[in-house]
Amino acid sequence: MAAKIRRNDEVIVLVGKDKGKKGKVTKVLETGKVIVEGINLVKKHQKPVPALGQQGGIVEKEAAIDASNIAIFNDATGKADRIGFRFEEGKKVRFFKSNGETISN
C-alpha cells in the first residue's frame, strides 16, 4: 500500500493530548507511526557519556504518534482531510478527497 502521509506533509492531530495541533512530519516509521515536529513531546532522562563529551540531564524530544491519529491538513479548506490516489499524465499522484486538489510533493 502506498504511503498516504509522507515526510514534510502538514498534518493535524485528531486525538490525544495534542489534539488540534498542527505540525510538519519529520519522519515516517515502518511501524505505521510518524514523528511530527513539536507534537507528542516527552522528557527523556539522558545519562552522561564522557567518552563522547555528552552531558547528562533531562532532554525534551518528539515521540512517535500512530498514523491513524493524524490527518493531512488542507490549507484551502482549513480542516483535516483524507487522501486519495489517481493517475495524472501517467504518474500516480495524491489528492485531497474534499476538493479534488492535487497535493504537491
Curated annotation (Swiss-Prot):
Biological process according to GO: translation
Keywords assigned by UniProt, alphabetized: Ribonucleoprotein, Ribosomal protein, RNA-binding, rRNA-binding
Keyword Acetylation: no
Gene3D superfamilies: 2.30.30.30
Summary of subunit composition and partner proteins: Part of the 50S ribosomal subunit.
Role noted for this protein: One of two assembly initiator proteins, it binds directly to the 5'-end of the 23S rRNA, where it nucleates assembly of the 50S subunit.
Listed name of the protein: Large ribosomal subunit protein uL24
Species whose genome carries this gene: Aliivibrio salmonicida (strain LFI1238) (Vibrio salmonicida (strain LFI1238))
Lineage per the UniProt record: Bacteria, Pseudomonadati, Pseudomonadota, Gammaproteobacteria, Vibrionales
